[in-house]
Amino acid sequence: MTILCLILAAAAPVSDLKATARDGQVFLTWKEAETTVDVYLASEPIADLTKATRIGHHLEPHSARDWWEDPASFKKGEPHGKPVGFRIQDGGERLDPSGGLFVHTVRKAGKLFFALTSAEDARVIASTSVVAAPGAIRPIWQRDGQPPAPGVGKGKPLWLSLHAKGGVVANSEYLLFGDETMGWREGLPFKFSVSVQNGEVVVRPTDRVWIGRPHNEAGDAGTPAIWTFWFGYNSNIFDRKLMASGTPVNYTERRNLWILDWVRRYYQPDPNRWYCSGSSMGGCGTVSFGWQHPELFAACHAHVPIVSYTYLGKGSATRLEPSCWTGHIAPDLKTSDGVPLLDRMNATKFVAETGNDLPFLFMIHGRQDGSIPWENNPSFYRALSAAPGLRGLLGQRDSFHERQGCPC
C-alpha cells in the first residue's frame, strides 16, 4: 500500500518588505495577510530580538490604509468608506490599502536593520535594511500637484484654529508621521491644514489619534480615532487594561508645537502676530495650550471653554478621564512632566502663579451652559482681576453653548 503525504506550505504572512529613506525618516512598506506585527531595529542583521530595539508595536492588519479618509473612524455607527492607502510622497500615488506601513524617525546615521515579527509569537517574519541619516522631518503634501512655495505666508499674521469635540478637518493639505515623542507609539500619522486666506496663514490641526480599538469608555465616542481636549492621553491608551500603569502625556500639545514650528520655518508668518482661537473643546485648548504659550501668541479668543478641570458641579475633570486615566483622577496623578494632571489643566492656578506675561484674552461663557460647567469660572475671573497687568474681555450669556449649537 502506498501512502501519499501532501504538505501545503502556508503563505508567508508578510512579503515584499521595502525600506525607503528620505527627509530624516525610513518608510517601511510591505504586502501582508491579516497580520498584526511589531517592528524591531538594530545596527546589524537581526537574528536575536534581545539585541534589537522594538520601535513599533500593535500595528494592525492593513496599516497602510488611510483611516483619516474613512468616516467611520470619527463617528460611531457611520458606514465605512471605500479603503484608500496613505499618500507618502508629495502629490504621489496612494499605497495599496491592504498592505502594511510603518515610519521610523532616524536618530543615528548608518545602515539600519529592520525586522517585522508576528505580535502573537514574536517570530521574525520579514527583514530588510537601508542606509539612512537624521534630518528635519517634514509633512507630506496630500493634494494633487506641488505644495506651495516656501515663504508664501511671509510677513502675514498666523491664526491657529482649534476645532470642537467631534470635529475633524476634512481635506487637510498635510500628513506627518510623528516621532516617538508625539504619540503612544512612533510613526502615528496625523493630518493638518495650512492655507493662506484673506491675508492670513490659517493653521487647522485635528485633535484625533488612532488607538487601534473602540474607545468605548468615552460614552459619546466609541470610535478608534479619539479626541484629547487638545492636551494628550495615556501612554498605554492602546490597551485599556494597561492604562493604570501608564502616564498622561501631552502628546497633542507636542504635535501642535511641531506643526507651528514647521509653519514658522516654511510659511514664514510674522512672529509678532500669532493668534489662537477655538470654541467649546477648541476653546478649552485655546486656554490650556494657546494662552499658556505667551512666547508664541499675541492674543487668544476662547469661546465657552473649560478653564479648569475639577470635580465641582458637573465635574469638568470627567472630560479627561476616558483618554488620560481609568476613572476618577486623583489630585496626585502626575503627567510625564512630573506635574499633577489636574494642576496642569487648571488655568486659575496658572494665572495665580504666572504673573502678567500672558497674551490678551477674549472669552465668552454662558451661566446656564449645559455642557461647560459654570462653577469653575468665578474663581478664574477673580484670579484674572487680582493678577497685575493682565488684560481681557469677558462676555456672558445664558445657555450660550446650546444657542450656538456647538458640540462639546
Describe each model-derived feature in a short phrase.
Residues 163-199, 204-215:
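Short, surface-exposed "cap/lid" segments of acyl-processing enzymes
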Residues 95-105, 109-111, 119-176, 187-192:
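A domain-start/cap signature at the N-terminus of enzymes
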Residues 38-110:
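Recognizes extended acidic, P/S/T-rich segments that occur
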Residues 11-35, 121-141:
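Pro/Thr/Ser/Gly-rich low-complexity, intrinsically disordered linker/stalk tracts
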Residues 27, 111-115:
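Short, conserved beta-strand segments of beta-strand-rich sandwich/propeller modules, principally
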Residues 161-163, 308-406:
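The feature captures the conserved acid-bearing segment of alpha/beta-hydrolase catalytic domains
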Residues 271-325:
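Primarily recognizes the serine-hydrolase "nucleophile elbow" in alpha/beta-hydrolase
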